[in-house]
A protein has these predicted regions:
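Conserved SAM-binding loop and adjacent beta-strand
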Residues: 69-84
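S-adenosyl-L-methionine
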Residues: 55-58, 64-72, 122-156
Length: 156
Protein backbone atom coordinates (compact mmCIF):
# COMPACT_ATOMS: atom_id res chain seq x y z
CA UNK A 1 0.00 0.00 0.00
CA UNK A 2 1.06 3.58 -0.57
CA UNK A 3 0.92 6.58 1.76
CA UNK A 4 0.33 10.28 1.24
CA UNK A 5 3.65 12.07 0.82
CA UNK A 6 5.14 9.10 -1.01
CA UNK A 7 6.34 9.25 -4.62
CA UNK A 8 4.58 7.02 -7.13
CA UNK A 9 5.15 6.12 -10.76
CA UNK A 10 2.32 5.47 -13.21
CA UNK A 11 3.06 3.81 -16.56
CA UNK A 12 0.45 4.04 -19.30
CA UNK A 13 -0.24 1.74 -22.27
CA UNK A 14 2.27 3.67 -24.40
CA UNK A 15 4.96 3.17 -21.71
CA UNK A 16 4.92 6.87 -20.74
CA UNK A 17 6.04 7.37 -17.16
CA UNK A 18 4.43 9.82 -14.74
CA UNK A 19 6.16 10.53 -11.43
CA UNK A 20 4.45 12.52 -8.67
CA UNK A 21 3.93 12.79 -4.91
CA UNK A 22 0.66 11.60 -3.38
CA UNK A 23 -1.37 14.31 -1.64
CA UNK A 24 -4.59 13.90 0.39
CA UNK A 25 -6.73 15.97 -2.01
CA UNK A 26 -4.53 15.43 -5.06
CA UNK A 27 -5.52 14.26 -8.52
CA UNK A 28 -3.45 13.00 -11.44
CA UNK A 29 -4.75 14.59 -14.67
CA UNK A 30 -4.09 13.74 -18.32
CA UNK A 31 -6.06 13.97 -21.55
CA UNK A 32 -7.23 10.43 -20.64
CA UNK A 33 -9.12 11.52 -17.55
CA UNK A 34 -8.03 11.87 -13.95
CA UNK A 35 -7.26 9.64 -11.02
CA UNK A 36 -7.70 10.68 -7.37
CA UNK A 37 -4.64 10.17 -5.19
CA UNK A 38 -6.95 8.67 -2.54
CA UNK A 39 -7.66 5.78 -4.94
CA UNK A 40 -3.93 5.15 -5.46
CA UNK A 41 -3.25 5.05 -1.69
CA UNK A 42 -5.55 2.06 -1.27
CA UNK A 43 -3.78 0.00 -3.97
CA UNK A 44 -0.82 -2.37 -3.88
CA UNK A 45 2.35 -1.85 -5.88
CA UNK A 46 1.94 -3.40 -9.33
CA UNK A 47 -1.83 -2.85 -9.42
CA UNK A 48 -3.54 -1.59 -12.55
CA UNK A 49 -5.54 1.56 -11.85
CA UNK A 50 -8.02 3.26 -14.18
CA UNK A 51 -8.69 6.92 -14.83
CA UNK A 52 -12.18 8.40 -15.06
CA UNK A 53 -12.07 7.76 -18.82
CA UNK A 54 -10.91 4.15 -18.41
CA UNK A 55 -7.22 4.62 -19.25
CA UNK A 56 -5.11 1.99 -17.49
CA UNK A 57 -1.90 2.67 -15.59
CA UNK A 58 0.47 0.33 -13.81
CA UNK A 59 1.19 1.64 -10.31
CA UNK A 60 4.79 1.34 -9.07
CA UNK A 61 7.28 2.82 -6.64
CA UNK A 62 9.85 4.81 -8.61
CA UNK A 63 13.41 3.57 -8.83
CA UNK A 64 16.39 5.85 -8.31
CA UNK A 65 16.74 5.90 -12.11
CA UNK A 66 13.14 7.10 -12.52
CA UNK A 67 13.71 9.89 -10.02
CA UNK A 68 17.06 11.01 -11.48
CA UNK A 69 15.56 11.25 -14.97
CA UNK A 70 12.56 13.30 -13.83
CA UNK A 71 13.79 15.16 -10.72
CA UNK A 72 13.85 18.95 -10.56
CA UNK A 73 17.30 20.23 -11.44
CA UNK A 74 19.27 23.40 -11.69
CA UNK A 75 22.48 21.95 -13.06
CA UNK A 76 23.18 19.37 -15.73
CA UNK A 77 22.54 15.91 -14.33
CA UNK A 78 24.76 12.82 -14.51
CA UNK A 79 22.55 10.15 -16.10
CA UNK A 80 22.06 6.62 -14.70
CA UNK A 81 24.15 4.99 -17.46
CA UNK A 82 27.13 6.98 -16.16
CA UNK A 83 26.33 6.87 -12.43
CA UNK A 84 26.85 3.11 -12.07
CA UNK A 85 30.34 2.99 -13.66
CA UNK A 86 31.41 6.07 -11.67
CA UNK A 87 30.42 4.40 -8.40
CA UNK A 88 32.03 1.12 -9.41
CA UNK A 89 35.31 2.74 -10.46
CA UNK A 90 35.35 4.86 -7.29
CA UNK A 91 34.71 1.69 -5.23
CA UNK A 92 31.77 3.17 -3.32
CA UNK A 93 30.71 0.82 -0.52
CA UNK A 94 28.71 1.08 2.73
CA UNK A 95 30.58 3.41 5.06
CA UNK A 96 32.88 4.84 2.37
CA UNK A 97 33.82 8.44 3.12
CA UNK A 98 33.42 10.53 -0.03
CA UNK A 99 34.50 14.08 -0.78
CA UNK A 100 32.30 15.48 -3.58
CA UNK A 101 33.04 18.76 -5.32
CA UNK A 102 30.19 20.29 -7.31
CA UNK A 103 26.90 18.75 -6.17
CA UNK A 104 24.77 19.96 -9.07
CA UNK A 105 21.28 18.49 -8.69
CA UNK A 106 22.42 15.62 -6.45
CA UNK A 107 22.17 12.62 -8.79
CA UNK A 108 25.65 11.31 -7.97
CA UNK A 109 25.15 12.10 -4.29
CA UNK A 110 21.90 10.09 -4.20
CA UNK A 111 23.53 7.14 -5.93
CA UNK A 112 26.45 7.07 -3.48
CA UNK A 113 24.19 7.62 -0.46
CA UNK A 114 22.00 4.74 -1.65
CA UNK A 115 25.12 2.55 -1.57
CA UNK A 116 25.83 3.59 2.01
CA UNK A 117 28.50 6.25 1.52
CA UNK A 118 29.01 9.18 3.89
CA UNK A 119 29.43 12.35 1.80
CA UNK A 120 31.03 15.69 2.49
CA UNK A 121 30.12 17.88 -0.46
CA UNK A 122 31.07 21.36 -1.59
CA UNK A 123 28.99 23.44 -3.97
CA UNK A 124 29.83 27.04 -4.83
CA UNK A 125 26.24 27.90 -5.78
CA UNK A 126 23.72 27.99 -2.96
CA UNK A 127 20.78 27.27 -5.30
CA UNK A 128 22.46 24.06 -6.53
CA UNK A 129 23.37 23.00 -2.97
CA UNK A 130 19.75 23.54 -1.89
CA UNK A 131 18.39 21.65 -4.90
CA UNK A 132 20.73 18.70 -4.24
CA UNK A 133 19.65 18.51 -0.58
CA UNK A 134 15.97 18.77 -1.49
CA UNK A 135 16.32 16.00 -4.09
CA UNK A 136 18.14 13.75 -1.60
CA UNK A 137 15.41 14.34 1.01
CA UNK A 138 12.60 13.86 -1.54
CA UNK A 139 13.82 10.48 -2.76
CA UNK A 140 15.90 8.95 0.03
CA UNK A 141 14.14 10.57 3.00
CA UNK A 142 15.26 13.01 5.68
CA UNK A 143 17.35 10.32 7.40
CA UNK A 144 19.74 10.27 4.40
CA UNK A 145 20.74 13.86 5.22
CA UNK A 146 22.60 12.60 8.31
CA UNK A 147 25.16 11.07 5.91
CA UNK A 148 25.25 14.13 3.65
CA UNK A 149 27.17 17.17 4.86
CA UNK A 150 26.90 20.07 2.39
CA UNK A 151 29.05 23.20 2.43
CA UNK A 152 28.24 26.21 0.26
CA UNK A 153 31.70 27.46 -0.59
CA UNK A 154 34.52 27.11 -3.07
CA UNK A 155 36.35 23.83 -2.59
CA UNK A 156 39.72 25.55 -3.13
Amino acid sequence: MFAFGEKVLLIDAKKRRYLFTLKPDGEFHTHSGFLAHSVIVSEQEGAVVRSTKGAEYILLRPTLEDFVIQMPRGAQVIYPKDLAPICMMADIYPGAKVFESGLGSGALSMTMLRQGAVITGYEIREDFANRAQINVREFLGAEALSSYQVHVKDVY
